[in-house]
A protein has these predicted regions:
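Glycine/small-residue-rich loop that forms an oxyanion/phosphate-binding "nest" at active or ligand-binding sites
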Residues: 1-30
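Short acidic, glycine/serine/threonine-rich loops at helix termini
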Residues: 16-18, 86-90, 167-168
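Conserved phosphate/ATP/ADP-binding segment of small-molecule kinases
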Residues: 22-98, 107, 126-152
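Short glycine- and Lys/Arg-enriched binding-loop motifs that mark or flank ligand-binding interfaces
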Residues: 75, 109-111, 171-173
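A structural signal for small-residue-enriched, beta-sheet-centric alpha/beta enzyme cores
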Residues: 99-109, 159-160, 164
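Short glycine/threonine-rich catalytic loop with a Thr-x-Gly-x-Asp
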Residues: 105-122
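Solvent-exposed, amphipathic alpha-helical segments
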Residues: 117, 121-132, 161-168
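Charged C-terminal helix
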Residues: 134-179
Length: 179
């Protein structure tokens, strides 16, 4: 199988703090077409698109669809930064189609690092999906090709895992800071 590359553009923390110098933003934009999937949070998506941060899912979806179409890269819209009961994630594919994975919003302060965790989980599951897809295809033209269905299944698994992890973390009561 060919490598699967997931880029988590760690540019802006949930607190709003910038983690990447503005001069490096174009370099990160230049990387996007070279990866399979990118997992920006809402403020990072806005920086990549050179727009204001989305306030609604529809605005985030529009930004992601434009970025995906322009780069040929699947963009994951992470619902954790948006309002509403659904904190799910959506894969927006370069052809404009999307696959949403619903998950209820949890009332938790234990969310520091969940974006990185989602990206790592997604990268792992995409590798599993690609391996299973490749084995099922045996030696056909589809061998080694990551499909939108593979990405959707990996996102379902990763979203469920992250939701369960956040829920389980609520009872730990460790540390004293945010997250």
């Amino acid at each position: 199988p060919v490598p699967v590359v997931v880029l988590d553009p760690v540019m802006i923390a949930s607190s709003g703090d910038r983690l990447l110098q503005a001069e490096a933003e174009q370099a990160l934009r230049d990387l996007v077409p070279l990866v399979n999937v990118i997992t920006p949070n809402i403020p990072e998506l806005a920086v990549l698109c050179q727009k204001e941060p989305a306030q609604t899912f529809d605005e985030a979806h529009e930004q992601a669809a434009n970025l995906a179409a322009a780069t040929g890269t699947t963009v994951i819209v992470k619902g954790g930064h948006l309002c509403g009961q659904d904190a799910g994630n959506t894969a927006v594919f370069p052809d404009g189609t999307c696959a949403h994975v619903r998950t209820p919003r949890l009332d938790s302060r234990n969310t520091h690092g969940t974006g990185c965790s989602l990206s790592s989980s997604l990268a792992t599951r995409l590798g599993v999906e690609l391996l299973q897809h490749t084995e099922a295809a045996e030696h056909t033209a589809e061998q080694g090709v990551l499909t939108s269905e593979d990405t959707h299944r990996a996102l379902q698994w990763s979203t469920r895992w992250l939701h369960e992890s956040i829920a389980a973390g609520a009872g730990l009561q460790v540390g004293s800071g945010e997250g």
